[in-house]
Structures are given as structure tokens and as C-alpha cells.
Amino acid sequence: FVLQGGEDGYYTDERIIHLIRMIKEQYPDCAITLSIGEKSKESYQAYFDAGADRYLLRHETYNHEHYRQLHPSNLSPGHRQQCLRNLKDIGYQVGCGFMVGSPYQTPVNLAEDMLFMKELNPHMIGIGPFIPHHDTPFAGEAAGTLELTLYMLGLIRLMIPKVLLRPHCTWNHPSERT
């Protein structure tokens, strides 16, 4: 089971814990994966204690300056990276990742992302090309390429051979038939 959502105030820790326990009671042999954003270490521990097994949290970008160009000033890459470390310390199977070709991204940023993932040694990695959305400040930016994404996937496989590389819904090449 995957429980996924944004950072929605309706879903308090108590509600999430209740959902986890209900699922575990009915399906005790199934893993529960959460993808619900940045939380406190105490919240992560409570979800784990209730029965959650895995947590997906893209690190987005390791580089502080690049992160600031993509996110509001009240968010920080250091906090997000610490969340991933906390999750691993608790005992979750952890997934991280980033977008390839995001605005302002440099080859150095990609190298830093690779080194961070090598150090974190997550169980799962999800990357995919940046796709601009018309209702965002990045609407006019170029999309990331499939070629660079595949290249980065190859490097990840060489650096972390046993990691689960999760398929991404944006991997369809524009020239493919549907």
C-alpha cells in the first residue's frame, strides 16, 4: 500500500497512524509506504511504530543555492536531507530522488546529487525529467531530456548497484507511439 499526498493539515499524525494501523490489521503481510512530505522525527517514529515500512521523500537537489531557486525561502535542503537521515536511522526503507533538467540545474548540481545519494545509500531512488507545468513560474522553462535521465540512471546503477530504481511516469519518449 502507498499512502501519498502533500503536506495536508487535515491528515494529522493521529489520522495517519489510524490509517496505518487499519491497513496493518487487515493486511498484516503487506508493506506500507508513505510519501507525505517532511515531518518531525517524532512523527516518523510514530508512523513506523504503527506499522509503516517505507518512506519516499525526494531530496530534490543537494545544492543549497539550487534548492533556493526552486523552493520558497522557508524550506531548506538541509532539513530535507536530515529528514531522509532520520528515516534511515529509525529503520525505514527509504527512497529519495530528484528531477533531471530542472531550472538552473548544472552538471555540478547533478554530481552533488549523486554523491549525496551514494552517502545516504537509500533502498529506492526515483528520478525523472523535469516537465514544466503551465500554471507554475517555470512554465516557460525547457523540459529535462530522456537522454540525460537515462544517463543518470546508468550512473546510479553503477554507484549503488542494488538500489531499486523506481519507474517514473514521465519516461515515455515523445517519439514513441502510444
Would you name each region that the model predicts?
Residues 1-2, 13-99:
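Radical SAM/AdoMet-radical enzyme domain recognition
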Residues 2-13, 65-67, 129-141:
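Glycine-rich, proline-tolerant flexible connector loops at the mouths of alpha/beta enzymes
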Residues 3, 27, 53-54, 59, ...:
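Conserved C-terminal portion of the radical SAM core fold
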Residues 7-9, 36-40, 61-63, 100-104, ...:
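Active-site-proximal loop/turn and secondary-structure-junction residues that shape catalytic pockets
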Residues 14-19, 110-114, 144-149:
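Charged helix-capping and loop-helix junction motifs
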Residues 40-49, 102-118, 172-178:
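Catalytic cores of alpha/beta
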Residues 143-146, 164-177:
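Active-site-adjacent loop and "lid" segments of alpha/beta metabolic enzymes
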